[in-house]
């Protein structure tokens, strides 16, 4: 399980950086953008989206060094010249016997310094999931805490592409704390005010991919999903889905989920989104054979190939109450009706 998670972590980080660099490249800069070095107010009725990916190292108060496996990816709305809101996925590296990651909702204050430099201070609630051991038994611990950061941006491309240095501090309730220094890239995008999903159409998608229980020595399985999604304006959507997680002898769940989605269009054809909601499932490997209520957390990148068809990549995390958390990396194809 540890090797698989390392491969997944590298894939997520590498693909995030490569994709962000591609989308923010000179060939994608709009001709009508302002020449000013720092972001300015968006055009009326047009959202401005910020995306970033950072990587680095740090230490935890339990387990020590993160072994250069800490990283964070996030995206959100730029509200004005100074304030933004974000959703982020944070992986706190690999301290000894701890593999903690999770999702944070952040408020951010940005202060321009000079022509190309800006200081940024962010903080918000952080829901974490830690794969560890308690009394020599595998445990998936869930805790709430606060993720706070101070960062410096240097804009390489005016009003667009920037380099970022970020210091993170995680303060947990009843768990260990951590500090990390991260380096990476980011970009501001003029979000399309009318993304494809905002036209009121129902989107039906099918998904397939890998499914891995967050325990040592558990084989990887195939997972599948069928989903129906509807928009709520330009920034939100809701969905209902049937989820099959495979059966590896430890977890064999299937069930139905409902999620609320935050949707951020970064190009006329590209959209980032994150969803969360309840997931009711039955586990064939559970002796009680009873229904259980879990949480399904998702992050997704979508390309609108045509007006009717979209292709997507998605990461699902099934957060359980019985130490059988599951990671699903999936590709999907959806059609608008």
Describe every region a protein language model picked out.
Residues 126-142, 147, 151, 269-304:
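Outer membrane beta-barrel transmembrane domains
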Residues 27-91, 180-232, 236, 328-336:
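Short glycine/proline- and aromatic-enriched beta-strand/turn motifs that initiate or cap beta-hairpins
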Residues 65-71, 99-103, 142-148, 177-181, ...:
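Residues that define the transmembrane beta-barrel architecture of outer-membrane proteins
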Residues 53-61, 69, 89-95, 125-133, ...:
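Transmembrane beta-strands of outer-membrane beta-barrel pores
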Residues 81-87, 115-119, 156-165, 191-197, ...:
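Repeated loop/turn-to-beta-strand initiation elements of outer-membrane beta-barrel proteins
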């Amino acid at each position: 399980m540890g090797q698989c998670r390392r491969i997944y972590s590298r894939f997520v980080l590498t693909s995030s950086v490569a994709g962000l660099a591609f989308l923010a490249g000179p060939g994608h800069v709009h001709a009508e953008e302002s020449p000013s070095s720092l972001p300015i107010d968006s055009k009326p009725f047009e959202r401005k989206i910020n995306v970033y990916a950072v990587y680095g190292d740090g230490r935890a108060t339990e387990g020590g060094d993160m072994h250069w496996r800490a990283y964070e990816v996030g995206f959100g709305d730029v509200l004005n010249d100074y304030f933004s809101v974000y959703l982020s996925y944070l992986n706190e590296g690999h301290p000894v016997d701890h593999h903690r990651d999770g999702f944070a909702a952040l408020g951010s204050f940005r202060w321009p310094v000079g022509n190309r430099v800006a200081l940024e201070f962010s903080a918000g609630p952080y829901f974490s999931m830690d794969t560890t051991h308690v009394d020599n038994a595998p445990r998936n611990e869930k805790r709430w805490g606060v993720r706070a950061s101070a960062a410096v941006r240097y804009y390489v491309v005016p009003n667009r592409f920037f380099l970022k240095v970020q210091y993170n501090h995680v303060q947990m309730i009843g768990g260990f704390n951590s500090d990390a220094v991260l380096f990476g890239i980011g970009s501001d995008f003029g979000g399309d005010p009318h993304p494809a999903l905002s036209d009121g159409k129902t989107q039906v998608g099918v998904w397939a991919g890998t499914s891995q229980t967050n325990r040592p020595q558990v084989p990887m399985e195939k997972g599948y999903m069928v989903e129906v999604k509807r928009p709520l304006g330009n920034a939100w959507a809701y969905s209902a889905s049937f989820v099959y997680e495979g059966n590896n002898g430890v977890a064999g769940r299937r069930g139905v989920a409902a999620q609320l989605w935050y949707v951020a269009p970064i190009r006329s054809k590209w959209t980032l989104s994150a969803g969360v909601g309840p997931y009711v499932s039955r586990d064939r490997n559970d002796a009680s054979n009873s229904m259980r209520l879990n949480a399904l957390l998702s992050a997704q990148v979508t390309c609108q190939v045509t007006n009717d068809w979209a292709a997507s990549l998605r990461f699902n995390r099934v957060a359980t109450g019985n130490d059988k958390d599951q990671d699903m990396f999936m590709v999907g194809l959806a059609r608008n009706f």
